[in-house]
C-alpha cells in the first residue's frame, strides 16, 4: 500500500509503459513489461493484472481488431505472463479482489462487468445492462463503483449485486452559466454590401450587420440555440441571406437589410447545405448540399430546381457569370480528377471546360465576362529526391484563363503598334444615356463551347498552390505562398497585395481582408493594400447560452454523421433511436467535456474507428514544462544520482539534441549529478524536482 502504479510514454512516443513510485515520492521504477495500460495488483502485491493497450478514452465501440485488449497476468517471480481472457472483444479495467479479477467486456455487445476466478479459471458475467455501457469502474477493498447511463453504482464483490448510489452535488455550475463573448474572436465569414458601407459578418453562429466606418453594430439573429453561417449581402443591397439550422435542418433564410423578421426560403430540407451564392441580379441563389446536388432557387417565388447531382462527389466553387446566364463549378470525374464545367441555365446543359487528365478547380468568371479563371495542376516540373532514386511531382498548380469567346485574343499575344488618330466624338443621345450605362455595367457573356479546351492560357507564374481567385478582366488576384497577389494582364507583372486573403464586394468596388482577428476594407487594390485602419469590431458581443448551444452542437454532430457517413444504412444501426438514447442525457450536461463525452458515446455506436470529437472550448490548466536529460538515472546509496545510460542525440538539431551530449558538456555514463543550479541532489528524493520549469532553460 505504499506504492503508486501509473502509465507513461516517456520512453516511447507510441506505446506506454507502467511505472511504480513510492507514495512519498522518489525516482520511479519501470515495470519490466513491453507495454501497459489499466492494471491492478493482487492483494499480496506479487502479481499484476493489466491491459497492454489503453484506448478507453477514444470513441471506439464493438472493436475486434488488433488493438482489442485482453487481460494479462504478470508474475515477476516466474517472469511469466498469461492471457486470462483470450477473447476477440474488448476486455479492460482489471480489478483484482481476493481470488477474483473483475473486468469490463463488450463480448455480449453492451459493455458489462465480468469476473475471472483465479482458482477455477472460469469467467462469468456479473452485470446485465443493455442500454448504456458500464464505464470507468474502480475498486477499493471489496467494493466496485462504476458509471452507467449517467448514474453511479456500487457493488459488493461478495453479493455481486449493483446498487444505484444517490449522489447530490452542491454546484453553481459555473461552466454552464450564460456569458458575453467577444464575437470578433469567432469570425467565420464576412460579406460587404454592394458599395462597401457596411458588412455582414458571421461569428459563433450569429449574424452581425456592421458599419465599415461609423454606425451601429447589430446582431440580426440572436439565436443561441441555432447555428447561422455564411451570411451574404445581395448584390442589389436589399437583402441578407444566410444558412441556419433553427428548424433542426439547415435551411436558407432571407432578411431585409434594414431589419425585420427573416423569411425561410427553403423548407423540409433533407441534408446539409454546404455553400451558396447570389446571382448578380439578386434574383436567384445557387447552393450545394451533402447529396452532391446543385440547386437553383428563385428568391421571389421560392421555386427550387435541382440542376445537377453527382454520385462521384460534390460540386465546388459554384458561382454565376456576370450576366446571370451561366454557372461554373468544378467536380470530380470518373478518374477522380476534378474538371471545370460551365452550365447553361436556359439550355439546362453543362459543358466541360477542362479535360479529365489534369486536376482543375476553383473556377470564377472575370467580371468583364471574357475569361474563366481557374487553377489547375498541369505544371510538370519534377524535383529529384536527394535521399532516394525517385522524382517528386509537387508544386504543379498554376492559374489559367479559358478564353470564353473564340473572338477573344490571348492577353499574352504580342500586338503591332498602331498610330493613334485623334477624332471628335459624336454627341451622345441623352435619351439613350441610361440604357448605354446599364448595358455597359452588365456584360453579355458569350461562350463558344467548341474548342474551348484549346483556348486555355497560363499566367506566367511558378508552380504552387493558388486559392481565392478574382478577376476584373484586367487584373487577376490569387492567394498563394506569401499572401494575396495580383497579376496585371496588360503589364504582365505580378504585384504583392497583402499577406491576408481578400474578398470582393458584389459591385466589384471594395475588398475586405481578414488578418489577426481584424477586418480591413479598402478599394480593390492595384498594388500593395493599405491595411492601416481596421473595422471597429468592438461591439460584436454575443450572449452565449451554453445549455442551448450544447444542444445545437449535439444535434449538428448527429446530422453530420447522418449526412456524411460512408454507408447510408449507418452500419445497420437505428441512428434516430441512438440520437434519442443519448439526447436523454443532455439535461445533465454542465460542461463542454460532458457534451464531448456524450457525443463520443453516440458516434461510437456506429462501430467505426477514427471518428473523434473536436474538444471545442474546454477549461484546461497551463502545463508546467519539465526539463529532461535524455538519460536513465538511478539513485546511489550516497543519495546522489548516477547516470546509467545517456541517449545519443543530434547536436545540430533543436528537436533531436540530447542535453548531456551537447558540445562542451562531456557527461559520461557512470558519472554522478551532485547538484542542479547549486542545490545538492542528495537533499531531494527525486532530482527531477529540481528540473521543473527548466525545459529549454540553461541549467548547471
What are these regions, as identified by a protein language model?
Residues 171-187, 445-462:
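A short helix->beta-strand "capping" segment at the edge of beta-propeller domains
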Residues 533-612, 639-641, 652:
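Terminal targeting/pro-maturation regions of precursor/exported proteins
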Residues 260, 688-700:
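PDZ-domain C-terminal substructure recognizer with occasional recognition of PDZ-binding tails
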Residues 124-138, 351-362, 460-467, 495-504:
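Conserved blade-ending motifs and adjacent loop-strand segments that build the rim/top face
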Residues 1-23, 27-39, 43-72, 76-92, ...:
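A flexible loop/linker signature enriched in serine peptidases of the S9 family
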Residues 609-655:
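PDZ/PDZ-like peptide-tail recognition elements
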Residues 1-3, 39-47, 93-100, 136-141, ...:
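Blade-terminus and WD-like Trp-Asp/Gly-His loop motifs, strongest in beta-propeller folds
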